[in-house]
Amino acid sequence: MTRLVSGVALAAATLVAIRFLPLLPLRVLACLVAALAAREYLELVDSPIRVVVLVVAMCWVVSSTAVASPLVLLTMALLWVAAEVLFSNHSIQQASTGVFGAVYIGMPLGMLVAVHALLGWQATLLLLGTVVVSDTMQYYTGRLFGRHPLAPAISPKKTIEGAVGGVIFGTLFLTVVGARILPFSGYGSLVTLGILVVLFGICGDLFESRLTRAAGVKDSSSLIPGHGGVLDRIDALLFAIAPFYLYVRNVT
């Protein structure tokens, strides 16, 4: 019951925020999500470099609609790695792990805000809906037909059959709904986009599972009752946004 209540509340809050919040408050909310997710990431990898990671991740969200800002931030991040190694006791691995966290979380959430700025709330909800439909159908298809493990060393319960179900239903959802929402460039493009979004989302889910397994924990945190942490909720989205964002940038 706790999982159901918190899930419904989270879904309702997300829907209201995306549908009704202007762009500036939405950026602030995305920054908060980035900060919470980055904090969980830093706990998982046990990184001593914390404040700068949080700041860079949030800066990526704030500057998401500026064309040159990702390159500027990436250059700053690389310089930061060099500075950390030269002027502190942190190793190259520690500094690089911190920078990766800022990119892994900040850049995708910045892309999500950019999608909202370019095409509005409907396109944003289309992406989120595709991820949710895919995740849900992976679960149910896997339970009904799952026989062959997808990545047993990382996520033993995920199956190839479940992944196929997620691809089919997620792609179908994006194609049918996207034809009404996105700038139309043919059903072939939408089907390809749907497949890429779902496959990237599956990779994002597996990547976060790898992080938690390496840390010896089940969830990234216990912030959301019954659902784990923020990173657990957005893991698929962080990867799935990339092909969706590139499509939006190229057709608008």
Describe the residue ranges of each PLM region:
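Juxtamembrane boundary at the C-terminal end of a transmembrane helix
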Residues: 245-252
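Transmembrane alpha-helix interface/packing and boundary motifs in multi-pass membrane proteins
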Residues: 197-201, 225
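Short helical (or helix-break) motifs at transmembrane helix termini and adjacent helical loops
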Residues: 133-143, 201-213
